[in-house]
Amino acid sequence: MKEFEVKVASTAFVLVLFSLTINQILASETSTKFRSPVPAPTVPDWNHLPNEGNEENVVSAPKQDGASGGQKPYWTKREKMMKRLHAEPAGNTVRFRCAVDGNPKPQVLWYKNDLIVQKNDRVGGYKYRNQVLILESVVLSDKGNYMCVARNEYGSINHTYQLDVQERSASKPILAEGLPQNKSAYIGDDVTFKCKVYSDAHPHIQWLKSINNHNNAAPNYTVLKAAGVNTTDLDMEVLILKNVSFEEAGEYTCLAGNSIGISHQSAWLSVLPVPPPTTDTITKGIPNETNIIIYVMCGVLVILFGLAVVLVLYYHCYNGKDPPMLVRIENPDNIPPMTKIEHPTMLFGNTQAWQRMCMPMQEPFEFNIQLDLQWELQREDITLVERLDEGFFGQVFKADLVTCNNTRKEKMVCAVKMLKGNRNEKDVLDLLTEMDQMKRVGKHKNIINLLGVCTQNGPLWLVIEYAAQGNLRDYLRRNRPQNTLCNLVLPSEGRNPDDELPVPHGDTLTQKDIVSFAFQVARGLEFLAQKKCIHRDLAARNVLVTEELVMKIADFGLARDIRSCDYYRKHTRGHLPYKWMALEAMSDNIFTHATDVWSFGVLLWEIFSLAGSPYPGIKTHELVKFLRSGERLDKPQYASQEMYRLMRDCWEEDPSKRPNFRTLVEDLDRMLAESSTEVYIDFAAGCEAEYSESSEDESESQNSDEEDDDSVFERMRQIDSLSNGNIPFNEEDSSNSDPYVAPLLQNEENVLQNEHARLRSEA
């Protein structure tokens, strides 16, 4: 028996030894050529499995080599790699983390069942982002062992995951037997019904109560509880009735449905009168003299303790200094605290006061902000890093915020919104209104959330979440395919090619990606609608994108609270996004949830045109006539017919015929489940017609995009009054393609009616 050693040389620095054993050499085999069973490597020559031991427990940085300062690979986030077995239903997304570091930076390879992973080895391909291997919509063929191998010249380590894909069974939801249970309660008690739902597909759960109809044998039902944006399945499995009365007695039903079918189970609630108290109960309820003394002493101690806490907080907040007083401000940069606006709508009720606030600042103005301990942050905990955006009156900075988690300090990245030195009284009030809106609305995954405010010892700061990928419009343009007609016209849209950022993940957008973007924005808008908030400035430029591609609705500078009524009428001449506005908003200055739905339709068009400019070639003074004639935006290149029908529904002239945001969320949820992960191939087709415009339109688009980049502070500035009743849709104004166009005032209604009559006669 003879042994032959075959040496395979690495393109870098690794030598791999393989042994070939031949038991008996025959004469006929003397000229046979032997070769290594290792396939020809397509990457640096460590496509084989490592032979140095798995070293899976290397969790800290090993010692450096004294001569070269190098380090062998080591795990940096071992705690996030502890789960080895992943059992997932078919269709789910699976992520395998391989967080590793070393000096030099180790190269990472992935193996499936001892074979190297190539990007297109599976349907939908593999994705690798931030040291994570991603398998979207897994199927049964994805089962197996996945091993991450990290190697540099000082050594190698590896880590193995096991994936088990389970076949989905198509069935309607299953409700746990015996739930909900029948209940009996006295008047004034609280009652809780529970219902356990099992469903492979995402279930939609509702709680119903039957209403006896004496005129009809079949009972009617009223919906007591339905799933919202922030509710989870666990929340929906519980129904709580507070302070029950006789009228609430009856049958309660837990209803669960999915795409396969519907299941339901019911329980009865009996409400009983409160029994009269017995003699023993009355005797026990009479406190004796000792108990009275104890109660009084406890009350005094509680009051003293509360006073001590207030004094400590008072001293801590002002550091021993006098509290802020109402002062006159000669320099706007030194604005002291200002009064919290409890009712923002009051700002628009007094016309004279509003006109006074809109005038340029000629005299010092006064503010007093009350301290809100729930939201107040210390300025010394915030470090401004770099300017992200700047408008005429405001600016946004990227910053580091130090927070205290128990006894440990942590640093997080945030954004800080503030005014510039040339602000006036109205600008400060606008920023205060935005702050109050964000406080009132609360937190949601798909809106930019308020982290805190700085109102003491300096100018007003709003500290908000940071979105690493910028706004959705710029993200879509950065991710347009390279070397297509779509990208060749970008410079004419007002963008500098030298400023283009690289594609963040190097992956071409798929249909599922852009449908997901639309679905996430719709969820955020549904949440705002539930909070009685109309945004008034929905556009791709006002949707921010995080590092994890989470869509977040931003820029509440134009948002308004409509809790007191269902609409908001604008009386001032502030700039508004004309090409995104509904017909009734253009003509009557009335904004409702239905006008936000229209704007969302234009935003959908932006998404599925990869950030195209709406209504190319149409001047602002021609837009009303264009829309009144029944014309709408054409179907964007990358939208399906069903998606375009959804856009057209949003653009119904009659606001009552437009869908609400809950319906939009449900439709987009279904489209997302049916969408494909196939990558778009023919991006060049149709781009020339969609993005190329005449030279005049290109100039208009350039001006529009430059204005789009400004923040809300510039958009809300006041413009000069109309001269002699001239309508703003004149030829001189048409040369300015500013997407924020001043609305018409009520005193121009006669001129507007004449203009509408002229447009109808021309049509």
Swiss-Prot record:
<dbReference type="InterPro" id="IPR050122">
    <property type="entry name" value="RTK"/>
</dbReference>
<feature type="binding site">
    <location>
        <position position="417"/>
    </location>
    <ligand>
        <name>ATP</name>
    </ligand>
</feature>
<feature type="active site" description="Proton acceptor">
    <location>
        <position position="537"/>
    </location>
</feature>
<dbReference type="InterPro" id="IPR016248">
    <property type="entry name" value="FGF_rcpt_fam"/>
</dbReference>
<dbReference type="Pfam" id="PF07679">
    <property type="entry name" value="I-set"/>
</dbReference>
<feature type="glycosylation site" description="N-linked (GlcNAc...) asparagine">
    <location>
        <position position="230"/>
    </location>
</feature>
<keyword id="KW-0829">Tyrosine-protein kinase</keyword>
<feature type="glycosylation site" description="N-linked (GlcNAc...) asparagine">
    <location>
        <position position="182"/>
    </location>
</feature>
<feature type="topological domain" description="Extracellular">
    <location>
        <begin position="28"/>
        <end position="291"/>
    </location>
</feature>
<feature type="glycosylation site" description="N-linked (GlcNAc...) asparagine">
    <location>
        <position position="243"/>
    </location>
</feature>
<dbReference type="InterPro" id="IPR020635">
    <property type="entry name" value="Tyr_kinase_cat_dom"/>
</dbReference>
<feature type="compositionally biased region" description="Acidic residues">
    <location>
        <begin position="691"/>
        <end position="711"/>
    </location>
</feature>
<feature type="transmembrane region" description="Helical">
    <location>
        <begin position="292"/>
        <end position="312"/>
    </location>
</feature>
<protein>
    <recommendedName>
        <fullName>Fibroblast growth factor receptor</fullName>
        <ecNumber>2.7.10.1</ecNumber>
    </recommendedName>
</protein>
<dbReference type="GO" id="GO:0017134">
    <property type="term" value="F:fibroblast growth factor binding"/>
</dbReference>
<dbReference type="InterPro" id="IPR003599">
    <property type="entry name" value="Ig_sub"/>
</dbReference>
<dbReference type="GO" id="GO:0005886">
    <property type="term" value="C:plasma membrane"/>
</dbReference>
<keyword id="KW-0677">Repeat</keyword>
<keyword id="KW-0675">Receptor</keyword>
<keyword id="KW-0597">Phosphoprotein</keyword>
<comment type="similarity">
    <text>Belongs to the protein kinase superfamily. Tyr protein kinase family. Fibroblast growth factor receptor subfamily.</text>
</comment>
<dbReference type="InterPro" id="IPR000719">
    <property type="entry name" value="Prot_kinase_dom"/>
</dbReference>
<feature type="glycosylation site" description="N-linked (GlcNAc...) asparagine">
    <location>
        <position position="288"/>
    </location>
</feature>
<comment type="function">
    <text>Receptor for basic fibroblast growth factor.</text>
</comment>
<keyword id="KW-0472">Membrane</keyword>
<feature type="domain" description="Ig-like C2-type 2">
    <location>
        <begin position="173"/>
        <end position="270"/>
    </location>
</feature>
<keyword id="KW-1133">Transmembrane helix</keyword>
<feature type="disulfide bond">
    <location>
        <begin position="195"/>
        <end position="254"/>
    </location>
</feature>
<feature type="topological domain" description="Cytoplasmic">
    <location>
        <begin position="313"/>
        <end position="763"/>
    </location>
</feature>
<dbReference type="InterPro" id="IPR036179">
    <property type="entry name" value="Ig-like_dom_sf"/>
</dbReference>
<dbReference type="GO" id="GO:0008284">
    <property type="term" value="P:positive regulation of cell population proliferation"/>
</dbReference>
<dbReference type="InterPro" id="IPR001245">
    <property type="entry name" value="Ser-Thr/Tyr_kinase_cat_dom"/>
</dbReference>
<keyword id="KW-0808">Transferase</keyword>
<dbReference type="InterPro" id="IPR007110">
    <property type="entry name" value="Ig-like_dom"/>
</dbReference>
<keyword id="KW-0067">ATP-binding</keyword>
<dbReference type="InterPro" id="IPR008266">
    <property type="entry name" value="Tyr_kinase_AS"/>
</dbReference>
<feature type="binding site">
    <location>
        <begin position="388"/>
        <end position="396"/>
    </location>
    <ligand>
        <name>ATP</name>
    </ligand>
</feature>
<keyword id="KW-0812">Transmembrane</keyword>
<keyword id="KW-0325">Glycoprotein</keyword>
<feature type="domain" description="Ig-like C2-type 1">
    <location>
        <begin position="73"/>
        <end position="164"/>
    </location>
</feature>
<feature type="region of interest" description="Disordered">
    <location>
        <begin position="691"/>
        <end position="742"/>
    </location>
</feature>
<keyword id="KW-0547">Nucleotide-binding</keyword>
